[in-house]
């Protein structure tokens, strides 16, 4: 009788282990494919709970009061709300001393008599700048104001949507400052924080899940009209991934914005699909009458226009 060879049983055991490993690897691969297919290929129905559906599309004034008043000024916002508009869309940036001010361009040159970047100026320096004369030489006193001033002024009069301008991924503190002010004024029901940058919106939700957020997007990089009004050194290109709908589909699942703010030139099939899925969609910025009519006919949550009075008239017809 021969002595058993340990190697005789080891080979089947190795075969069984190898088979289990292959099956486990295949299962992991299948799971990964399914996850990726869901993230990038599936568009589920909107399930947010913080947005109340209006009976008709809302009309917001772009940059305060569109073409009717100085860009991003409280002066403009007061006149837009007095005109009966549902809300206003403005832009927020941090100053050198970490105050959140409302201002569109990264530099102050185009809109004021001063020069330099917003990030390099103190809050006091920014608030001393008058937005009036560059809009109309006869207009004085339309000074830059803080986000807090806007929140205080808009309360009870309409909705304030503020784009937080953060070009990169590094934390700047802008989200914390915005959330602190919303909490201080119990402004959750009339302030929306928006951004092209999904990381910013993710941080906002981590700070306070009840703050309403809006993801802004477009299909192209900046068009010549937008480029023409920005200093060459201030142009921040929109990253390629944020211009691809399949990637934005995944971003929406991870970041979970409450609303979408979609450029009116985005692929119409994308726009129609998101509205059909129940997303509260703002369409920006249809300004020509035909573009306004097309946007309003889609029955979006709202439109943001540089011609808000005409948009309001068309909506109410």
What is each stretch, according to the model?
Residues 2-317:
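Phosphate-group recognition and catalysis centered on beta-loop-alpha active-site segments
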């Amino acid at each position: 009788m021969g002595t058993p060879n340990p190697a005789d049983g080891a080979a089947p055991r190795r075969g069984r282990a190898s088979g289990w490993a292959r099956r486990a690897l295949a299962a992991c691969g299948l799971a990964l494919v399914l996850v990726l297919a869901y993230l990038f290929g599936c568009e589920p129905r909107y399930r947010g709970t913080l947005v109340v559906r209006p009976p008709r599309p809302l009309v917001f004034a772009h940059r305060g009061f569109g073409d009717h008043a100085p860009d991003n000024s409280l002066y403009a916002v007061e006149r837009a709300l007095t005109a009966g508009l549902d809300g206003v869309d403005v832009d927020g940036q941090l100053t050198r001393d970490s105050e959140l001010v409302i201002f569109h361009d990264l530099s102050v040159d185009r809109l004021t008599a001063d020069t330099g970047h917003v990030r390099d100026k103190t809050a006091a320096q920014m608030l001393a700048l008058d937005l009036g004369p560059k809009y109309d030489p006869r207009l004085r006193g339309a000074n830059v104001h803080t986000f807090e001033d806007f929140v205080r002024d808009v309360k009870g009069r309409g909705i304030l949507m503020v784009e937080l301008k953060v070009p990169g991924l590094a934390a700047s503190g802008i989200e914390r400052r915005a959330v602190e002010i919303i909490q201080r004024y119990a402004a959750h029901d009339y302030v929306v924080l928006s951004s092209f940058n999904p990381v910013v919106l993710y941080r906002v939700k981590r700070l306070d899940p009840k703050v309403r957020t809006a993801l802004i997007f477009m299909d192209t990089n900046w068009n010549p009209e937008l480029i023409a009004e920005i200093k060459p050194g201030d142009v921040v290109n929109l990253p390629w991934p944020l211009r691809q709908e399949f990637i934005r589909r995944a971003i929406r699942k991870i970041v979970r914005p409450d609303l979408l703010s979609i450029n009116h030139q985005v692929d119409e099939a994308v726009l129609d699909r998101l509205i059909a899925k129940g997303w509260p969609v703002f369409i920006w910025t249809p300004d020509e009458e035909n573009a306004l009519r097309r946007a309003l006919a889609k029955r979006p949550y709202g439109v943001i226009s540089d011609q808000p009075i005409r948009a309001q008239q068309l909506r109410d017809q």
